[in-house]
Amino acid sequence: MSTTPNIGFISLGCPKNLVDSERILTELRTDGYNIIPSYENADLVIVNTCGFIDSAVQESLEAIGEALEENGKVIVTGCLGAKENQIREVHPKVLEITGPHSYEAVMKHVHKYVPRPERNIYTSLVPAQGVKLTPKHYAYLKISEGCDHRCTFCIIPSMRGDLDSRPIVQVLDEAKRLADSGVKELLIVSQDTSAYALDQSKENQNKTVFWNGVPIKNNLITLCEQLGTLGIWVRLHYVYPYPHVDDLIPLMAQGKILPYLDIPLQHASPKVLKAMKRPGAIDRTLERIKKWREICPELTLRSTFIVGFPGETEEDFQMLLDFLEEAQLDRVGCFKFSPVEGAVATEMADQVSEDVKEERFHRFMQVQQRISAARLQQKVGKTLAVIIDEIDEEGIIGRSMADAPEIDGVVYVDNLSEQEVKVGQVISVSITNADEYDLWGTC
């Protein structure tokens, strides 16, 4: 019988949390622990939680409860871990609780309850890029932690702290390791990607450092330029609409990074945006979108919006629908406002009823589905680069440059056998059909 300790692991939440899970798993593996997908034979279970909205809190609490019931020895980390009292009220038998990105504390607790093995059979087996929970051909790369904004619907800063950017050389080194390991697409994530390095002094931002023998400075534009030298797809997520985002568009037009911008705008009514503490110059946003598309006609714009925010009137909501018609965004996510404990907006007056939220959500989605369908229809007859995600007996599924994994659409590829392509390969596909979300094509 093996004497190697077994650690069960549960990862919940967003891609940023997934990156934290990968970091913890890499350290566990490096220390010689065996990672298993079940509670039954685990010496200890780690639950990496999400606490962004109430439904995520409930999911996390249920996962902790299940781990306690099935195993009994549980360590909790992640965003909900920042609210230790809330967890202990429901689950007092949890061994230890840490907040997000508390890698050293998690490992200290693991060592306390399950001492590291004397003979580490795994060290030589841990890949240079670390343990990854994504398919081998794409990976999330987190460039910073925390956020300096204080949006009234959000509690992320209270859980993850203020902005803390990673050194540019460290980020680029990790990106190169991932590319060298066979990753074909990097998804750049953080709480606020466009704020990268803005937390550092002007002196540090302007200081010249060297990477791969090239002199570089510590800022987002330089980071993207250097990522563009790796010869793989680079996709930006969570880009707050700072003015300097305009400088990214030429890099997309030049093919250095993917022509894809995930930019959460949240609303279009100046009154609602002010209440959210978000940028409110929506006319300026429309002008920027027009300019971006002139510079980079292939640009895909994704955004997210909240309907039913406290104080949102029918007039405010109509402004949002009008904005959708004018902006003609490619991909859109919509969320009904959800009260979150600790968020300023939760205590605001004029809360919108659930019935009205639901009705506005459906009206919003009807408008955007029509827009998305029309924009996808424009791709019929074109030839697109498609990265292959899945190959099975039912067919071949991939994504175009306009599609991020899990949140966007896919491309179904016909008349191609399993023997002709492999997962992670980028192929040219002629688009023959489209609906509101997905494309179909042939090689």
UniProtKB/Swiss-Prot annotation:
Transferase as UniProt keyword: yes
Membrane-traversing stretches: none
Binding sites annotated in the UniProt record for [4Fe-4S] cluster 1: 14, 50, 79
CDD domains in alphabetical order: Radical_SAM
Compartments, record wording: Cytoplasm
One annotated Gene Ontology cellular component of this protein: cytosol
PANTHER family found in the cross-reference section: RIBOSOMAL PROTEIN S12 METHYLTHIOTRANSFERASE RIMO, RIBOSOMAL PROTEIN US12 METHYLTHIOTRANSFERASE RIMO
Protein family (similarity comment): Belongs to the methylthiotransferase family. RimO subfamily.
Name of the featured protein: Ribosomal protein uS12 methylthiotransferase RimO
Lineage: Bacteria, Pseudomonadati, Pseudomonadota, Gammaproteobacteria, Pasteurellales
Gene: rimO
